[in-house]
Amino acid sequence: MMKFQDFSSGLYVAAKFSDSTLDEIENLQRELKVPNPVPRHKIHSTICYSRVNVPYVVSTGSFEVANSGELQVWDTQDGRTLVLVLDSDYLKFRHNYARALGATHDFDDYSPHITLSYNVGPAQFSGIVQVPVILDREYKEPLKINWTEDLK
């Protein structure tokens, strides 16, 4: 049973991907000559970034969660971020599961994605990419508000 103080720490949940998916993502980063690529060991998809902790149970199993994505550049407070937006009913379902438990979300909607670079500068990217995205596992940890410090 969760105690009151457990709810104040926040919750972060993410999906990690199979080695074959990581190989595909790294190949994509190289082919596109992505500036400042996210390193292999940090490639993930955020499922839940909640300012309150909830009793989320991570999923187990390895299976395809998407087979394509759309390249988009998002303007963020940290710069121009290149993402591969995934059409994944599974990741949306897991996000909605967290929300049903009471998790918060800072944006109007949830767009499952894999960040390819947190800083692409003026470079432009767009298009649909065929890539099998295979879940390896989910993990959860206390929310780190200053997570961008880990990127340095």
UniProtKB/Swiss-Prot annotation:
Which cysteine pairs make disulfide bonds?
Answer: none
Question: GO terms for molecular function, please?
Answer: hydrolase activity
Q: What Pfam families is this protein classified in?
A: Acb1
Per its record, the protein catalyses: 3',3'-cUAMP + H2O = U[3'-5']pAp[3'] + H(+); 3',3',3'-c-tri-AMP + H2O = A[3'-5']pA[3'-5']pAp[3'] + H(+); 3',3',3'-cAAG + H2O = G[3'-5']pA[3'-5']pAp[3'] + H(+); 3',3',3'-cAAG + H2O = A[3'-5']pG[3'-5']pAp[3'] + H(+)
Give the residues the record marks as binding 3',3'-cGAMP. Answer: Y12, E141, W147
Q: Which UniProt keywords apply?
A: Host-virus interaction, Hydrolase, Inhibition of host innate immune response by virus, Viral immunoevasion
The active site consists of H44, T46, H113, T115
Q: Which GO terms describe its biological process?
A: symbiont-mediated suppression of host innate immune response
Q: Which InterPro entries match?
A: Acb1-like_C (IPR056175)
Q: Which residues form a coiled coil?
A: none
* Signal sequence extent: none
Q: Which residues bind 3',3'-cUAMP?
A: Y12, E141, W147
Source taxon at top rank: Viruses
What job does the chain carry out? Counteracts the host CBASS antiviral defense system. Phosphodiesterase that enables metal-independent hydrolysis of the host cyclic di- and trinucleotide CBASS signals such as 3'3'-cGAMP, 3'3'cUA, and 3'3'3'-cAAA. Does not cleave cGG or cA4. Besides evasion of the CBASS system, might also enable evasion of the type III CRISPR systems that use cA3 signals.
Q: Which family does it belong to?
A: Belongs to the anti-CBASS protein Acb1 family.
Tell me the protein's name.
Answer: Anti-CBASS protein Acb1
